[in-house]
Amino acid sequence: MTRRYWNINLEEMMEAGVHFGHGTRKWNPRMAPYISAKRKGIHIINLTRTARFLSEACDLVFDAASRGKHFLIVGTKNKAADLIASAARKARCHYVNKKWLGGMSTNWSTTETRLQKFRDLRAEQKTGRFNHLPKRDAAMFKRQLSHLQTYLGGIKYMTGLPDIVIIVDQQEEYTALRECVTLGIPTICLIDTNSDPDLADISIPANDDAIASIRLILNKLVFAICEGRSSYIRNR
């Protein structure tokens, strides 16, 4: 895999607060190699390590996108939900930003059934079929559609398991990460100082609570994916 330059700037990361970890009492000792200092009761993340692993992640997603691979971005924190959705749409990735339903990947046949139900209901709504049903039935189908849109809206075009999964906040998305590990799906994971850096294929040490930090990391990955997709289109 060729290494490329992704304009990852340490000063820019500091301005976004990427270096702020959790309180020193909440740390995972395995994160010690990624921590540079303690300040006012919190751990400070070593941004040179962040830059290194973010660059590796950008190389990986560029290479995968240039070969037409598919991505899934997972981040279900309320304050980051809109950011996850917009980043995924920009890079034409699938996403989960509300709740990871247990077995979403390991029990893919059930997920496929739910997705087909979702597509059928969307088609019926578009054709106006709901308008010809009794009010009670129409209301029931609309509730089902709303529920499916909330939890499956970001993966409605998925036809199979993703090739790479990008996870924002290891602690919050532990179930999703474990499912990916079980299936052997490569993972890129934002990890704060309370995380285990050994679980994902590429772990990017970063503040996973601040929106500015999450946005910066995602923007770099999205740019790399978009560049890879452009390369794929040119070389087809």
From Swiss-Prot:
CDD domains assigned to the protein according to its UniProt record, in alphabetical order: RPS2 (cd01425)
Compartment(s) of residence: Plastid, Chloroplast
GO molecular function: structural constituent of ribosome
Main location group: plastid
GO CC terms of this entry: chloroplast; mitochondrial small ribosomal subunit
GO biological process: translation
InterPro entries in alphabetical order: Ribosomal_uS2, Ribosomal_uS2_bac/mit/plastid, Ribosomal_uS2_CS, Ribosomal_uS2_flav_dom_sf
Keywords, sorted A to Z: Chloroplast, Plastid, Ribonucleoprotein, Ribosomal protein
Domain of life: Eukaryota
Pfam families linked to this entry: Ribosomal_S2
NCBIfam families in UniProt: rpsB_bact
Family: Belongs to the universal ribosomal protein uS2 family.
Protein name as catalogued: Small ribosomal subunit protein uS2c
Organism this protein belongs to: Ceratophyllum demersum
